[in-house]
Amino acid sequence: MRYQPLSRRLINLIYPLVIYMAIGMAVLGLYPNGGLMANLIEKVSCIIIMGILFYKDSKQIRWEGKKLSLYSAIIMIIIGICACIGVNMLFELTGLKTIREEDAKNVAKALYSDKLWLQILVVGIAAPVAEELLFRGILYRRMRTWLSVGPSALAALLIFAAVHGNLLQALYAFILGAHLIW
């Protein structure tokens, strides 16, 4: 990718986030009580748009990353599951879970009050794919064109955590995002 001034680089980082949030606000405006179905519409819309941006970036940014073998992917999934359990246990032991218990209850109510297949589709597939495309597929890769691995990863993690809204989700997103970006 050719040299770009700092202002252009920042715009290239900000506009995918703005699009992501605008889609969320538009869907919320159209379906204020839409629950997980509205969330599914939002995430699928994000996957399509972020997929287009990712595809365009793939043509411009030469990615030097290693290919992930099936064995490594399975190991990473197992480590991710263990990390989820570990983070939950850590939050329980330290009392962090009670910091914003009302927020946690509201999130749980919104996520787990619909049909199981819809929960799996939204929470287990659509949301992670949309977030991975945006935060690691677009933002992290764009930052890697002008920053080293460490600062790029840290910046992407901080943005990923901040977008999750409340302290508990931000901490959780930061810790698990660090596993994914590693």
Give names to the regions the model predicted.
Residues 62-130, 145:
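Juxtamembrane helix-loop-helix connectors linking adjacent transmembrane helices
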Residues 28, 32-33, 55-62, 92-100, ...:
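Transmembrane helix-loop junctions in multipass membrane proteins, especially transporters and channels
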Residues 116-182:
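Transmembrane helix-loop-helix hairpins at the membrane interface
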Residues 24-28, 50-57, 88, 123, ...:
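Structural signal for membrane-spanning alpha-helices in multi-pass inner-membrane proteins
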Residues 30-45, 114-119, 148-156:
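Membrane-interface starts of transmembrane alpha-helices
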Residues 15, 19, 23, 41, ...:
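Hydrophobic faces of alpha-helical transmembrane segments in multi-pass integral membrane proteins
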Residues 12-57:
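Alpha-helical transmembrane segments in multi-pass membrane proteins
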Residues 1-17:
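N-terminal membrane topogenic signal
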